Swiss-Prot record:
Keyword ATP-binding tagged: yes
SUPFAM superfamilies named in the record: Ribokinase-like (SSF53613)
EC number(s) given by UniProt: 2.7.1.92
GO terms, biological process: inositol catabolic process
GO molecular function terms attached to this record: 5-dehydro-2-deoxygluconokinase activity; ATP binding
Pathway(s) served: Polyol metabolism; myo-inositol degradation into acetyl-CoA; acetyl-CoA from myo-inositol: step 5/7
Highest taxon above the source species: Bacteria
Function: Catalyzes the phosphorylation of 5-dehydro-2-deoxy-D-gluconate (2-deoxy-5-keto-D-gluconate or DKG) to 6-phospho-5-dehydro-2-deoxy-D-gluconate (DKGP).
Source organism: Photobacterium profundum (strain SS9)
Assigned protein family: Belongs to the carbohydrate kinase PfkB family.
Protein name: 5-dehydro-2-deoxygluconokinase
């Protein structure tokens, strides 16, 4: 069994860096966007989702990001505060940017999502707004990759990772690749490559690793070869998610294992990755083993996709353990 070495004497379990915005979910299931009568409002964005996931499990979480000086920005701040998330690293931008908004259908697949990110406030985060002392208060820094897509957020993200390395804060990169945020895969692969080299743990699906290997290994689809390529520099663990096939986990010491999924009735195809990361990270910061973390993440992902939102469908510790116990009894 594998454990990740952490600085346990810190007030925060994890700080998550990236976007926090608003998700508007269709009220009607299995309905096309044009026919939806209305939407329900929730906080969303990959980084916010992960932060909420860890917090709902009982973790002490901080956040680095930026929202606009608008009503949606205030809503995001208020909700995250209610969830017990420390917002000392959350900035407010008043330059005319806007908190990002996503409209989505509620379908198990072929689900249309409309995302409004012109002049997105989360991408206005500046390097000088990242406090190394804040990062040094946390066991982990969790970076979501969309923060790398544009300056000055790109530089702020990379300097946050550098600060984390200097303070012995474990760095996790959740690739979170959104093609619409990048000019080309080549551009994306360059900056993701830099970020991966600064990370202790890299989490992505096969398509995301394909992007990261655009220059170094174009056309490679072999997970073992991918892991060998990324288990260099600082990286200790590579996790390749494969949807219904589960996850493959590779460690620098040569240990590797697989984790299957927990099958549920899927209501929506998104939120699973963020819930997976939350379950994994919460387990690791509490001294749990990597194998248990991946299992907890897989269960949390299943719970989330069977719910009606992302943040509100993140499980508590009790819900998570009850779900796993029930499923394992059924085997």
């Amino acid at each position: 069994m594998t454990k990740i070495a952490l600085q346990q004497d810190r007030p925060l379990d994890a700080i998550v860096l990236g976007r926090a915005g608003v998700d508007l979910y269709a009220r009607e299931a299995n309905t096309d966007m044009a026919d939806i009568s209305g939407f329900n409002k929730f906080v969303g964005g990959s980084a916010a989702n992960i932060a909420v996931a860890i917090s709902k499990l009982g973790g002490k979480v901080g956040f680095i990001g930026c929202v606009a000086d608008d009503a949606f920005g205030g809503y995001v701040r208020g909700y995250m505060t209610e969830q017990g998330i420390n917002l000392d690293g959350m900035m407010t931008d008043n330059s005319g940017s806007r908190t990002s908004v996503a409209f989505t259908e509620m379908k198990p697949n072929d689900c249309t999502v409309l995302i409004y990110r012109n002049k997105a406030s989360d991408l206005t985060l500046k390097p000088e707004q990242v406090d190394p002392a804040y990062i040094a208060q946390s066991k982990m820094l969790v970076v979501t990759g969309t923060a790398l897509s544009e300056s000055p957020s790109r530089e702020a993200t990379l300097i946050a990772m550098e600060h984390a390395r200097r303070s012995n804060t474990v760095v996790v990169l959740d690739v979170d690749y959104r093609p619409y945020s990048w000019r080309t895969d080549v551009d994306a692969s360059i900056y993701y490559g830099i970020a991966a080299g600064l990370s202790d743990i890299v989490i992505g699906n096969r398509e995301e690793f394909d992007m990261m290997e655009t220059v170094l290994a174009p056309g490679n689809t072999d997970d073992d070869a991918t892991a060998d390529r990324f288990l260099r520099a600082n990286t200790q663990v590579v996790i390749v998610k494969a949807g219904e096939l589960g996850s493959k986990v590779y460690c620098k010491d040569g240990h590797k294992f697989q984790q299957g999924i927990f099958r549920v009735e899927v209501k929506k195809p998104f939120g699973s990755g963020d819930s997976f990361a939350g379950g994994l990270i919460w387990t690791l910061v509490n001294g749990g083993e990597l194998e248990d973390g991946v299992k907890h993440g897989s269960a949390a992902a299943a719970i989330n996709v069977s719910g009606n939102s992302c943040t509100e469908a993140m499980p508590t510790k009790e819900v998570l353990f009850d779900f796993i116990e029930t499923r394992e009894q059924d085997l």
